Design a protein with these regions (language model features):
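Extended, well-folded catalytic/binding cores that form a central cleft or groove in large enzyme
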Residues: 1-169
Length: 169
């Protein structure tokens, strides 16, 4: 912000600047459609059985802050979906709560974008899918909508037959 202010003064356009806000900076924009939360060791911390609950909560809060910042910058209220029973679900619940709180405040960052009011169309809202990194998304993307290619890869299907060992293994 200091560089921006210095450049504005040097260029003589500082009189045109009405307001600069230092908020919603919980992410780093790398490209038009790519951003980074710049969180180190997040995966290790969230999957370490010895991790303190306070550290896990702090990590989840950091992820939520970054995602909220990105949504607020875009001015869009996403439809949030996550897998159940893990860090992704905890992030989804906290993010949903933070967005609801912001929507109930005056001057919220989503006033120009989609609203989360009853009767609003979810078609016009972006979809935010949260997955745990342990979730194997590639199998779903690489295989057709039928189970045959998946069965062929996983269960060694030969001549349209599959032998399944049921001896408890």
């Amino acid at each position: 912000l200091e560089e921006l202010a210095t450049s504005a003064v040097r260029s003589g356009v500082d009189a045109r600047v009405k307001c600069v806000r230092d908020q919603y900076l919980g992410y780093i924009s790398l490209e038009d459609n790519l951003f980074d939360l710049s969180i180190e060791d997040g995966y290790r911390l969230l999957h370490d059985p010895r991790a303190a609950e306070k550290d896990v909560e702090r990590m989840i809060s950091s992820v939520v802050t970054g995602l909220f910042s990105a949504c607020a910058t875009l001015g869009q209220v996403p439809v949030i979906r996550s897998q159940r029973g893990g860090a992704a679900e905890m992030v989804a619940k906290e993010l949903e709560s933070r967005i609801r709180d912001a929507l109930n405040q005056r001057g919220n960052p989503f006033e120009g974008g989609a609203r989360m009011t009853p009767g609003s169309s979810s078609v016009q809202r972006p979809l935010l899918c949260l997955f745990d990194r342990n979730f194997d998304l590639t199998a779903m993307l690489q295989h057709a909508w039928t189970y045959q290619p998946l069965v062929h890869d996983v269960l060694n299907m030969r001549l349209n037959r599959v032998d399944v060992d049921t001896d408890g293994s």
